[in-house]
Amino acid sequence: MTLDVTGLDVELAGTRILDDVHASIRDGHLVGVVGPNGAGKSTLLRAMNGLITPTAGTVLVAGDDVHALSSAAASRRIATVPQDASVSFEFTVRQVVEMGRHPHTTRFGTDTDTAVVDRAMARTGVAQFAARDVTSLSGGERQRVLLARALAQAAPVLLLDEPTASLDVNHQIRTLEVVRDLADSEDRAVVAAIHDLDLAARYCDELVVVADGRVHDAGAPRSVLTPDTIRAAFDARVAVGTDPATGAVTVTPLPDRTSAAADTSVHVVGGGDSATPVVRRLVSAGASVSVGPVVEGDTDHETARRVGCPCTSVAPFTRLEDTTAASATRADIAAADVIAVPVAAAARPGVRGLLTGAVPTLAVGDAAGAPEWADRLVACDAVVSAVGALADTPSDGV
């Protein structure tokens, strides 16, 4: 059952909250809504489930305007897990979950309702709380109870507003695994406002980036979560890479500050794990960093991938001389303002032949003095200031 949002405008108390929002959620898909605080994510979900009447535009569920449906009819099609997990009355956990069956049942319920409620509680890990007063639970436990209530509602469309906000890491993963399974195995259309960009990228098929009440971008996580889009939507500087364990996009926030290396183009020669601390310091300082040559799968290679740096790699045991990687590295070096070479990396066969002296070069590490191929020798913790200074100083050649 598809959910289609077209030209949605929402004004509250004379303030425009949403402006011309378009989105389409298909069966079997989990769509994440991401954006900064106050962007309009919660308002969008409340308009989707009919709680807020839009100023303009439509929300169609299976072709019917959700705002024209009765409350019971809308609840049979759309279930919602709110951000606020507070419950005002002293119901037991089971009674709260049973409320999800109200759109489907008569006053007395059926054996089917009982089975659906039991399964929902087991699936969300709250069955052990069934007889407890829901107000006695922690915020995270209550959040899981509300998810169980939504599952018991058995609606083909599920909306979740920050479903992991009150949960510890274990239950964040468990909750999103349940939600992912609802889309995959039960073909539900799921929309979730998610604060954590890494979790959103890992579990969602598509992301909708909302900022200032508008959709800034929408699509697959890898196409949407780019440094430029995140900068525009969140006003944040980030590095975007790939998690080696999950293969999902990862977003690493970086300090937005001025440093000696800010906006300087630096090529870092790698090998093993020698370049990793250098790359991390330079990326955090705002430098534009490329890396290579590194060996595929080693620590420097994974670091470059995770922080989103362009990287030239070679297969293990490959001779560097006269390879495509050597040519690519020479091009990166020629385009850089400064080269940073860990002393250990310079010992790799073929690396010294890449250092022509045409670009100012830093040796990074411990040595008795600057090697003949470098303009300066610095410790790793001084590489940022050294890059800034050397970028303004012509190389003497080597």
From Swiss-Prot:
Enzyme Commission code: 7.6.2.8
Entry binding sites for ATP: 35-42
GO molecular function ontology, one term from the record: ABC-type vitamin B12 transporter activity
Cellular compartments annotated: Cell membrane
SUPFAM superfamilies in the record: P-loop containing nucleoside triphosphate hydrolases (SSF52540)
Gene3D superfamilies, A to Z: P-loop containing nucleotide triphosphate hydrolases (3.40.50.300)
Listed InterPro entries: AAA+_ATPase (IPR003593), ABC_transporter-like_ATP-bd (IPR003439), ABC_transporter-like_CS (IPR017871), P-loop_NTPase (IPR027417)
Key words, A-Z: ATP-binding, Cell membrane, Membrane, Nucleotide-binding, Translocase, Transport
Catalytic activity: an R-cob(III)alamin(out) + ATP + H2O = an R-cob(III)alamin(in) + ADP + phosphate + H(+)
ATP-binding in keyword set: yes
Gene Ontology cellular-component terms listed: plasma membrane
Pfam families hit by this protein: ABC_tran
Enzyme class: translocase
Membrane topology term: Peripheral membrane protein
ABC transporter domain location: 3-237
Protein family (similarity comment): Belongs to the ABC transporter superfamily.
Role noted for this protein: Required for corrinoid utilization. Probably part of the ABC transporter complex BtuCDF involved in cobalamin (vitamin B12) import. Probably responsible for energy coupling to the transport system.
Record text on subunit structure and interactions: The complex is composed of two ATP-binding proteins (BtuD), two transmembrane proteins (BtuC) and a solute-binding protein (BtuF).
Identification of the protein by name: Cobalamin import ATP-binding protein BtuD
Species: Halobacterium salinarum (strain ATCC 700922 / JCM 11081 / NRC-1) (Halobacterium halobium)
Higher taxonomy: Archaea, Methanobacteriati, Methanobacteriota, Stenosarchaea group, Halobacteria
